[in-house]
Each structure stands twice: as C-alpha cells, then as structure tokens.
C-alpha cells in the first residue's frame, strides 16, 4: 500500500503511534498511513520558536525536520463535519516516516511517478472517445435513398424528422420496394485505417517509457515481443524496482519501523535482548522474481556459482528465501529419507 501510494501520489506518510497497555496489543505500536493530501502544501510560515514551516514540514535553524503539520481530516472527505477543531495538528518528526523518492537536491516533497505520463494519457483518452463517437455516429446511418424526381411517391414518404427529411427504418429480413427513379446508397463512412492502432502503439510506448515500465506490462500486448526483448526489458525494469526496494522502501520504511518495534517490544517486556544493537542489524529480502525461462536462468546461476562469480547465499536470497532456512529444510528432508 505504501509503494502504491508513492507511485500514484509521489509520497506516503506513516505515523508511528504507541498505544497503552490496556489496548490489548502484544506490542503496543500501530502504524497509521496518511495520504499526501493530509500534509497541506500551502502550510508555510514561521513558528514562535523561529522554525520555518515549508509545505507543511517544520524545519529548525539548521534545516533538520522537527515536525509535520497534518490535517485532522482529509480535505476531500465531505462526511467529516468537525469544524471546531484546528485545521492542522503538529506531529513530532520522530513519529513520522516520509516515504518518497527524491530526484532533485533539496527536494522536500514527493513527485508522482505517473506525472510525466498524465498529459499523454489524457490525450489518448480523448482520442479514443472521439474515435468511439465517430464509429457510433457512422453506425446509425445504414444507407440513403435518393430520388431523381422531386414529386412525392403515391404512397407518401416516411416519417419526417425535425429538419423535414424523410426517414425509413431498416429491420432484419426487410425487402424494400423502390419506386421508379429511387436508388439506395449505403453509408460508407471514412475510416482511419491502420493509423489508429499505430497511433495507440506509439503513444502507449511513450507512456511506458515515461513511467519506466515495460510496454508489455502496461498494455498486456506481447505480439511484437520475443524472449530476448522481454528479458532485456525485464532486466532493466527489475533493476529500477530493486533500487526502490532497497533505497527507498527498506531504508525509509522497513528499518525505522523495525527499530521502533524492537524498542517498544523491549519496553513492554515482550523481548529480552542482551544486545539490542545486534538485533537491529537485519537483512531485508524482497519477494522473488519469476523469469520468463526458469531453466535457462537456473543453469546460468549454477554456472556462476561454479565459476566463483557469485555465492550460493546470494542465489538463494534472490529467490526470496533465507539460505539458513533452506539449509534447515534440506537437512530435515534428508533426515526423513
């Protein structure tokens, strides 16, 4: 959820909230996820003690974050009728985790990852709607009956519309008898031909590039892909994802939460740690990646281990498991046999 919020809104705030012992929690700690809208961009100014508030974030004289000024309710929530409470509440910075990926020096708020593609997606949506309206309009006219003589037929014309033009309905199995001088011309609306699909492909290709995602993952279209192209795109895509996993999610979210959880659990008497500093030294293993051709990848990993390029620990951790746990399971399986 944090990663999705960061991708859509550019950032996510996690408030660490210690609880009372009577709340019945095993470890009296909860996390509250706050959207980007909860921290107002227009909250700026000076505090009484001389700190500076920029975009809802309070900085001290040396530029260190000391507090966040959150709204008490979401600005788009029309069901919250609390109007007597202050607009914002000050939360100390040690209780707030600001999850975002900075791309500029001095950046203090997150930028949505989908922002570079929004204009193209909006124009593509308008183009699709216009093409759908054009096809709907063209499908309403089955054909036209033309006459060479201006006189009315003996049996009268069809029911006229508001402009005075006669109209005739067309039903399945109808055999229309025409009078002398009348002719039927079927509607042949202009078509965009092959330009529609080519335009969509180029636009979605640019959208995929701006999002940093492979084209086939954005559209689900693998008609023009092969094994080599899919693997090349996936390798680059997974490199970007791993940067976010280890450089943003693990560093900004997992490590602070783990440290606070250990602290609260030890204070609550749930853990007896002889070396708290060693307990904080953990390794974060993200979920594994599934390859297009697992056989070739496993063979390549085996060759890399035999050549001494990589270790078995790294190969096992790349699958999302802990090497010690795998060794214990293998030993248990061997003991059963």
Language-model features: locations:
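Surface-exposed loop-to-helix/strand elements on domain peripheries
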Residues: 176-295, 324
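Hydrophobic side-chain positions on well-ordered alpha-helices
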Residues: 5-6, 265, 304-305
